[in-house]
C-alpha cells in the first residue's frame, strides 16, 4: 500500500503524539497555571521523578508514582506537587500539599488517561522553585469509557476508607501509608452502560486530607482523572504512637472520615 506524500507531509506537520502533547503544555497549560515562572526540567533537575507505564494495559487505572529526592526539612521542602495529563479533557489530575511532617513528598495514585499523552508532575518548593518530571503514556478512551460492573460495589460501600502502613512502623522515620476510598468517581463524560445515551453528571472525590496527631501530612485537591476507588500512597513521620485521620469530600457534598491507630508493635493491617 502506497501512502501519498501529501499524507506524510500532513502527519509531519501535525507532529508526533509526544510533540502534540508538548505543544498542549507549552501553549496552554504552562501559561495558564504557572505564567512566566521558570520550571527546571530534564537533567537540570534532581528533585523528583515521575514513573508510569509507557503502554497502559487499562487506561482507566494507570499507576503513577512520583519519587522525590530531597528530604522534607523546615528550611527546604516540597510544598506542592501538581499532576497534569496534557491531552485529558480536564488536564489537571490533582494538587497535593505537603509539610515537613510528611518526611518525604512521594505520592502514588491511579489515573485515567484519555489519549496518548505526557503525564507531568511539577514540584513547588517552599522557596518558590519549580521542578518538573514527565513520562509519556500510550492510552485512549479512559474518560469516556463506561465504568466497570464493579462500580456497583463502590456505590454500595460509598465513602468506606481502608488504611494500612506498608511494612513495619518505624518511629522518627518516613513510613509509607496507603489509603483507599470506595467511590465510583464518575467523569460525567460516559454512560453507565455501553450503548446508553444517558450520561450521568460528574461525581467524584474532590478533596482528601490526612492528619496525624493533629499535624497535617498531606492534603489533595482532585479531579475525575483519578480512577474509581481513589487510592493514595504517601509518607509520614510518626514521632510517637497516635491516631491518623483521613477525611474526604466529593462533588455531591458528601463527607467521609476514618481513623487508624499507629503503634510500633501493632500488626500493619486495616
Features from the language model and the residues they span:
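N-terminal edge beta-strand
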Residues: 30-61, 151-175
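Aromatic sugar-binding surface patches on proteins
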Residues: 100-108, 224-233
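Extracellular Ig-like/FN3 beta-sandwich strand-entry sites
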Residues: 114-118, 174, 239-243
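N-terminal export signals
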Residues: 1-8
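Short edge beta-strand/loop segments characteristic of extracellular beta-sandwich folds
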Residues: 51, 63-72, 176-184, 192-198
Amino acid at each position: 500500500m502506497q501512502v501519498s506524500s501529501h499524507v506524510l507531509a500532513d502527519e509531519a506537520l501535525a507532529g508526533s503524539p509526544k510533540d502534540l502533547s508538548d505543544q498542549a503544555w507549552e501553549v496552554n497549560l504552562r501559561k495558564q497555571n504557572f505564567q512566566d515562572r521558570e520550571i527546571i526540567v530534564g537533567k537540570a533537575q534532581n528533585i523528583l521523578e515521575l514513573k508510569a507505564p509507557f503502554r497502559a494495559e487499562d487506561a482507566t487505572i494507570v499507576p503513577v508514582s512520583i519519587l522525590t529526592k530531597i528530604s522534607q526539612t523546615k528550611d527546604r521542602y516540597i510544598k506542592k506537587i501538581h499532576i497534569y495529563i496534557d491531552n485529558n479533557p480536564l488536564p489537571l489530575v490533582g494538587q497535593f500539599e505537603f509539610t515537613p511532617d510528611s518526611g518525604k513528598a512521594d505520592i502514588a495514585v491511579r489515573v485515567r488517561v484519555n489519549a496518548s499523552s505526557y503525564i507531568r508532575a511539577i514540584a513547588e518548593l517552599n522557596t518558590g522553585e519549580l521542578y518538573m518530571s514527565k513520562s509519556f503514556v500510550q492510552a485512549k478512551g479512559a474518560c469516556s469509557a463506561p465504568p466497570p460492573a464493579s462500580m456497583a460495589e463502590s456505590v454500595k460501600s460509598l465513602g468506606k476508607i481502608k488504611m494500612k502502613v506498608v511494612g513495619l512502623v518505624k518511629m522518627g522515620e518516613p513510613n509509607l501509608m496507603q489509603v483507599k476510598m470506595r467511590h465510583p468517581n464518575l467523569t460525567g463524560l460516559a454512560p453507565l452502560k455501553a450503548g446508553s445515551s444517558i450520561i450521568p453528571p460528574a461525581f467524584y472525590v474532590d478533596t482528601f486530607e490526612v492528619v496525624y496527631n493533629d499535624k497535617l501530612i498531606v492534603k489533595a485537591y482532585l479531579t475525575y482523572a483519578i480512577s474509581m476507588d481513589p487510592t493514595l500512597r504517601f509518607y509520614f513521620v510518626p514521632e510517637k504512637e497516635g491516631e491518623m485521620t483521613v477525611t474526604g469530600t466529593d462533588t455531591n457534598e458528601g463527607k467521609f472520615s476514618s481513623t487508624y491507630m499507629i503503634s510500633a508493635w501493632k500488626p500493619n493491617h486495616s
